[in-house]
């Protein structure tokens, strides 16, 4: 016959020994080799933000205000033509995003449009761009527990958010991406574009870890978004 009081003492002692481990798993973000923060996993935004200026107080220049007035989500949203979202809008898409860390790069694979964003850790921006792109050229480096990302080289086709905030080819986006805790990722943006805005402005997005999730196939055809299974 088992000694139940002794069993209870052993189980209780084991539980106490596990408390610091469990707390560490929750409070301290994981690291990869070389003590670089581990951002990998499938993430999804915690709160959808259609507009980065919901109160309508964006610091437009006259050019920026005129471009914003022309924006119509039902007519000329670039995404209606199945074009890439651009940055920062890609980071505000309300669909899962998977992050991979490989030598020299951080890769972000967004289910929306099945778009791949590359953040280069092993080079600088070119002195001149052969062509300007939707998502620009992203260069990253680690500063403590944050990934600092500098992105330039944009074309002027995309919107900054889902309601039509415009930008020019002078757009410069700076991000500080940090894993706040095991289940939370935070991205702080600074937006600079002297043609569209009278001053730099900031935005923030929070993401939550989605264990067990996978990125699904996404089809954009004839201006209609079709989602396939998760």
Tell me the role of every PLM-derived stretch.
Residues 2-3, 21-230:
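PEST-like low-complexity, intrinsically disordered acidic/proline/serine-rich tracts
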Residues 3-10:
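N-terminal Sec-pathway targeting helices
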Residues 10-21:
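Bacterial N-terminal signal peptides
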């Amino acid at each position: 016959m088992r000694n139940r009081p002794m069993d209870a003492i052993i189980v209780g002692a084991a539980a106490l020994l596990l408390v610091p481990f469990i707390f560490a798993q929750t409070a301290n973000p994981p690291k990869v080799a070389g003590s670089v923060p581990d951002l990998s996993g499938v993430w999804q935004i915690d709160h959808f933000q259609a507009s980065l200026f919901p109160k309508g107080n964006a610091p437009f220049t006259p050019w920026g205000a005129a471009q914003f007035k022309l924006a119509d989500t039902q007519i000329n949203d670039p995404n209606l033509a199945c074009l890439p979202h651009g940055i920062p809008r890609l980071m505000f898409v309300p669909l899962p995003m998977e992050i991979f860390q490989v030598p020299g790069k951080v890769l972000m694979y967004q289910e929306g449009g099945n778009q791949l964003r590359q953040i280069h850790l092993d080079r600088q921006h070119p002195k001149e761009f052969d062509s300007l792109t939707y998502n620009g050229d992203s260069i990253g480096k680690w500063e403590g527990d944050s990934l600092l990302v500098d992105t330039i080289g944009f074309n002027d086709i995309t919107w900054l958010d889902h309601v039509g905030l415009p930008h020019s080819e002078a757009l410069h986006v700076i991000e500080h991406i940090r894993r706040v805790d095991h289940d939370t990722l935070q991205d702080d943006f600074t937006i600079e574009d002297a043609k569209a805005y009278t001053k730099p402005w900031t935005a923030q997005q929070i993401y939550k870890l989605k264990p067990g999730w996978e990125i699904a196939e996404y089809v954009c055809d004839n201006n209609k978004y079709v989602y396939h299974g998760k």
